[in-house]
């Protein structure tokens, strides 16, 4: 009887692991599909130079670049972007979106 119970536990554990692996695979496929849709949308929104600039930013600040991409796609979907965005226009957008930097001055008494 103990062997039967042990075999049942192993079978359940194996099924659970397979289900978990299948869910991870589905999540990964969904993420890849989302990324492909995002890139297609950006190709329609941005001129090549602007896309290149955004890809360069993505290398150094991936979270910031992703946020900008999402905002651009949302603007395009809402109809607020009529023409392709040029590199100069993207620079302006990036300056507006970039949080203000604080400067610290350290003064030494002596």
Curated annotation (Swiss-Prot):
NCBIfam families tied to this protein: PRK04239.1
Segment forming the signal sequence: none
UniProt keyword list: DNA-binding
GO CC aspect terms: cytosol
Family statement: Belongs to the PDCD5 family.
The species this protein was found in: Methanospirillum hungatei JF-1 (strain ATCC 27890 / DSM 864 / NBRC 100397 / JF-1)
UniProt keyword annotation of Translocase present: no
Protein name: DNA-binding protein Mhun_3016
InterPro entries xref list: DNA_bind_arc, PDCD5-like, PDCD5-like_sf
MF terms (GO), sorted A to Z: DNA binding
Domain of life: Archaea
């Amino acid at each position: 009887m103990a062997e039967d119970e042990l075999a049942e536990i192993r079978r359940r554990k194996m099924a659970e692991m397979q289900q978990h692996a299948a869910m991870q695979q589905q999540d990964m496929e969904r993420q890849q599909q989302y990324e492909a849709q995002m890139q297609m949308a950006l190709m329609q929104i941005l001129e090549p130079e602007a896309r290149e600039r955004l890809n360069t930013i993505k290398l150094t600040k991936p979270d910031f670049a992703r946020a900008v991409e999402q905002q651009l796609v949302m603007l395009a979907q809402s109809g607020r972007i009529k023409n392709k965005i040029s590199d100069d226009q993207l620079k302006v957008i990036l300056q507006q979106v970039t949080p203000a930097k604080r400067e610290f001055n350290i003064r030494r008494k002596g």
